[in-house]
Amino acid sequence: MSNVSTTRFSLVLALCLCTGAALAAAPLDEALKALPSVPLQDPAKVELGRRLFNEPRLSANNSLSCASCHHLETGGADNKPFSLGLDGKPVPLNTPTVFNASLNFKQFWDGRVDTLQAQIEHALIGPVEMASDWKAVEYNLSAHPDYQRAFAQVYADGVSAANVQDALASYERTLLTPNSRFDQYLLGNTEILTIKEKYGYQRFKEYGCIACHQGVNIGGNMLQKFGVMGDYFKARGNPVESDLGRYLLTGDEEDRHVFKVPSLRNVAVTAPYFHDASAKTLEDAVDVMFKYQLGRTPSQEDKELIIQFLRTLTGEWAGKPL
Amino acid sequence: MRRFSRRRASQMLLGLIALLLASTLVFLYLKSSRDQTATYTQSRDLIRQLQQLNAQWDSEVLKARIAITHNYDPLVTPLSDMTRIWSELQDRDTYHNPADLPGWQASQAAYVAAIQEKARLVDQFKSHNAVLRNSLAFLPTAEDDIQAQFNQIDDQGRLQLQGVATDTYDLLLSSLEFAQVTSDERAADILVGLGKLAINKESLPSEFQAPVDILSNHISLILREQPLVNSLLERIAAVPVAERLDDLTTHLNQDQQNADLVDHQYHRYLLIFSTLLVVLLLYLAVRLLRSFAEINRVNRALQSANETLEQRVERRTQQLKDAQSELLDSARQAGMAEIATNVLHNVGNVLNSVNISAELVSRKLRGSKALGLGKAMQLINAHQGDLGTFLTDDEKGKLLPGYLNQLVEAIAVEQQGMSDELAQLSKSIDHIKDIVSTQQSYAGAATLLEPINIGALMDDALRMNAGALSRHHVTVVKEYAQVPQILGDKHRLLLIMVNLISNAKYAMSNLSERPRQITLKVEAQGEDTLKISVKDDGEGIPPENMTRIFTHGFTTRKEGHGFGLHSCALAAVQMHGQLSAHSDGPGLGAVFTLTIPLTLAGSSS
């Protein structure tokens, strides 16, 4: 009896919720998609990944952890143009944010790997980054009883390279920044954006920013040549090897200056911009984009509107806006 | 023995055959029981999913091509799904035909190469298509911007620039057409138009420069990108992902057919081996039944043998019993003979003195003075008439009265002597009567319980041996405690005592350096046991004989028959008593002790 009534009650409740939701907030069908929720994972695994993320033992001289360059309080990257590698020298590319990285179709600026696991390995072994190797990492972690216990709790085979990668990847999948105002707008709360921000979104679409920055991560799902409508690197001057982008990886002329289109989520808090950190402000970045990617000259007003829109893409981490 | 080993060998052979068949069956079962159909179905299902995703991918590419959507996520997700499904497919151990394995692997590699190529092309397509769509979408706006500039010019100037405006518009149209129908001709047209625009730009006012530049830039981009996008689309369409997947399916089908064939073969084998096993089992069952029958037969034989054996044992037991009773009888007879011998010996001794007495009497009778009386009477009879004279006158007559007086005295002495001798004789006869009556009172009496005075019985026993004892100069020491009359078997007790005393006497027959002494002891032990012991100072019993002395036929004497102690022990047991021997060693004498229940004569009637 009580079972039946409970079922009925929950049915009614579900109906109410559905109708309510339908009335209040039907998700918008846009080329930009709302941030998905964090996937269900083993909390112990995620916790282990969190510890590893902050673990300097992963680097060759126990000085750098993932968190050394990816500051979660400030946008998931550091505010330097180039983070300092293990040897204290700056790395050749601007550090991308770790936030929402799991939503990117490939990792790194040149999209050189497809999975978070591979990304972790590259960062860990990369000579300019943590410069370590798996043997040393396994040894360092196994020497620590806490880690031995924690690994044994989650993985049958204890400490191993694959398990370190898996734990870190699990943690990184939780590093999503939900609840940005634009996400709320996409989910149907159209009142949350100001009229100017809505105009900004409109301009964003009209000018064709959306051609590359779209999808669930507002970018991060394609490669694009930097300088479609003009030679950006010539204009910038001082060309360096890392400007070649994907070409370094494939050697294909087609890939010269081709980079992964970065996500625009939290773009307002992840300055400086571009792989070369050449744009210090959002305005600079938008200018470059207009000139070299869109080949258009926006009005000052439109540009400001777009920037206002871009600021609505800042989400929350640990319940606080970034 | 040989038969046994042959049986063992055949058993081992059977076991080996059974083991071999069973393991072959298990092997065949494992070989044929893999659910291959399911695996193939699942694998084919995965490939079908891959094909669906591939088709979905293609359709998303086309959608992006005609700019239905700006979202490029759908061009990413099919690939990641396919990668996931592919790894799932590879995790499966689907392929079975080892001969064709390289072909299968080659097909897989071909698929991987195709999908990588397609992914590369799709990525390129995304990049180029995005900018192309942007420019195409922007083209009318760009042209509008130029037209707006035209509109701002006065009518005079506009008339001058009418040609330029028319050219620009034509260029826009041909560019848009180019997007639809890409051909080299049109490309050439557009190139010409772009050249014209560049020339026209020179004659245009400065405010026109930027919009025209932008327009021409975008048109050049379209001119550049459109063929690229088209060729990319063709190349994407040409990537044989679907064909490779079909190849994989074909491969799987062939493999399944092969596997099915092998499976059928294994099934046949399984059937054959099962039949063999069943035959073997049947054979074993028959053997088992036969061995059961054999066991039953043997059991029955054993049972009957057992019964016979029991009967034989019974018979033998009976024989033994008979022998024992015979033995007992003979022992008893032997005992009785011994008693009789003793008795006769004693009787003989007494008869000797009877004989002497009788001789003496008869000799005295033969030399009797009574004969002188007859001569005197003859003299008297011859002188009947003149008796007086004769007595007074005659010489002889005068002597007669004196003679008669002497005769009377002599006859009186003679009578006295004979009377003494006859008294002795009758005493001896009494003795014999005693001995005989003693013997008679024991002989033949069965286990009759009667009141016994132990002391008197001991004395009787001694008396029966009295001759031998006195002949061997044996001193008897009696240590009789005060024992009440008991109820017992007089005959057996006497038998035991006579034997023990006789043995003691024999044991001391070789004793010369010291007096021979037998000590008889009677005492009550506790309230219910009577202990009678016969102790001698004789040759003793060596320890090795101690255990044997009561056994039948054991004797240390030349003329002994080995019945004595054995029958005594038997008699003791029959009286619910016990006969035991003790000796401190050879030459130290021995003590034989009889213990019997002390049943008071008054206690039972």
What are the residue ranges of the model-derived segments?
Chain A
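Periplasmic c-type cytochrome electron-transfer domains
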Residues: S5-T6, L23-L322
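Bacterial N-terminal signal peptides that target proteins for export
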Residues: S2-V12
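Bacterial N-terminal signal peptides
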Residues: S10-G20
